[in-house]
From Swiss-Prot:
Primary localisation category: membrane
Keyword Membrane part of the UniProt annotation: yes
Pfam families, per the entry: K_trans, K_trans_C
Membrane topology category: Multi-pass membrane protein
This protein's name: Probable potassium transport system protein Kup
Reactions mediated catalytically: K(+)(in) + H(+)(in) = K(+)(out) + H(+)(out)
InterPro entries xrefs: K+_transporter (IPR003855), K_trans_C (IPR053952), K_trans_N (IPR053951), Kup (IPR023051)
GO molecular-function term, one example from the UniProt record: potassium ion transmembrane transporter activity
Organism: Brucella canis (strain ATCC 23365 / NCTC 10854 / RM-666)
GO-annotated cellular components: plasma membrane
Amino acid sequence: MSGELNGNDTSAQAAVSAGSVLEGAAFADEGEQHNESMKTLVLGALGVVYGDIGTSPIYAFREALHAAATNGILARSDILGVVSLIFWALTLVVTVKYVLFVLRADNNGEGGILSLMALVRGALKGRPDLILGVGICGAALFFGDAVITPAISVLSAMEGLEIVAPNLTPFVVPATVVILVTLFSVQKLGTGRVAIVFGPIMALWFVALGASGLWHIFDDPTVMAALNPYYAVRFLTVSPAVAFVTVGAVFLAMTGAEALYADLGHFGRKPIVRAWLWIVFPCLLLNYFGQAAFILSHGEAAALPFFQMIPSFALWPMVLLATAATVIASQAVITGAYSVARQAVQLNILPRLEIQHTSEKLHGQIYIPRVNLLLGLAVVILVLGFEKSSNLAAAYGIAVTGNMLVTTVLLYIVMTRIWNWRVSRALPIILGFLVIDMLFFSANIIKVHEGGWASIGIATVLVLIMWTWVRGTRHLFQKTRKAEVPLDLIVEQMAKRPPTIVPGTAVFLTGDPKSAPTALMHSLKHYKVLHENNVILTVVTASKPWVASADRARVSQYNERFMLVTLTFGYMQQPNILRALGLCRRLGWKFDIMTTSFFLSRRSLKASVHSGMPLWQDKLFILLARTASDATEYFQIPTGRVVEIGTQVNI
């Protein structure tokens, strides 16, 4: 591949040549799909997957040049070195690592850090807590990225006003806040109607990127020499200290690369790869090389090269298009945050959250009010606190590089445990990725005092919350299990001293079907009655994203009064107990909602010095438990058929 990229072709031709080779490798095991359907999916991928990385040219090259400048002076070798670094970073990290390897590590078609964690946990039985910890760190870093992306993207687009109309400079931050507040405010309405234009707008954006870059490449065609890795290597070795800092800024060109994997389940591998190889990658290269050529011929333009190289007649349209593109990029990140939050709830990493479906046709379109509120507040606070996209740039890289580092570690386990690769085959590849990831991560971590503290702070708080929830639920389960009575013993006692039998069916939800549910025990204690039919219901989340309806329910008859039912959902599926119980008819149980009551136990938690957790963590867990959404709503049980029985537990 490097041979093709070092030839005499233009960057677009080189990327297309590389695309031919890479696409063949990426799709060697897939059949052809219908062309029209493929075009639609590719267009959709442009609007959802590539918004973040597609808007990076607005600020990435500018920040890299600022880092590379010595006393504010840029040499020709510096400019060529920076653009060469960007080219090879995009090639090695996005095209090689993600396109050729990471996108193959799907969990039944789904991607994302939590999908990868679930996949690895299923394959690596020995150390589930270690993998869970890695997955939690990855998810926390993703949310940190989700906070910073809308802030830096929209703010960088609005800074174009400084070029179009300098007198509007004081309004950049207020206008950014207005746009972001509006964006988060309309989330509850759903994006189904407007999402249809996301793809075409982003396609226009990439055309504008490529066209403006190609036009200015002719300012200094010798800029294409930077395709040669010699310029990147020379830049890294001549002044290592300056180069190290610059590498952290160069990484801004790759922010959003993780979206290729995160959105795998929405579009599939082939549309995502084709969109990258044939549209996004070439257009990004043209723009970056165009900015470099423009600066080589207009040395004074390093302040805002992206907008300064746009002709005056096209400045306003470009600012408007950039704003639209960054809003779309922000929307994609917000939607991704909802998806990851839902996965985290299903995998019991976060407490239950209220999840609203905004589309009757598309089940994946959801809105989570609490996530939206917290995300929106954090984004606005960042904009008001940092005020300039250049100030936010330092905070941006840490979250994304950390996430990529976690992905690489988990990818090694996938290679050796699931793909059954020999260590001698997998290790050199992973070590290569780790060297690159560690270089970018270390170059960004030194920016903690410049703003990186924001990213680390967000991730740390989220890790603390998620780990407290995981640890607390385990302690609670162990505590209640010690106090619970085995179901066998209760059934045996009822056989000797039968309670009063009343007509109807009682469904008792429990996490442990071997123990008598707390609600059943309190019902017998206070009401002294037993229903004619009793169902001990357990809801299980599988380590795969989707579970077919045929595999949803397992039913076993315990005795003439009791039945054990297990419902299994994928971590991407919203539990609907009513609908799932309807599937039990084919298994011999004729479920009738009109004669059925659901008994749920509502626990009142109190902190205890004997919980095994620090007191502050006990209190945090109790707070999280109190803020969890109602089980009746979460499991979609008709409220008129629910009986809640309260219990007090000292954890």
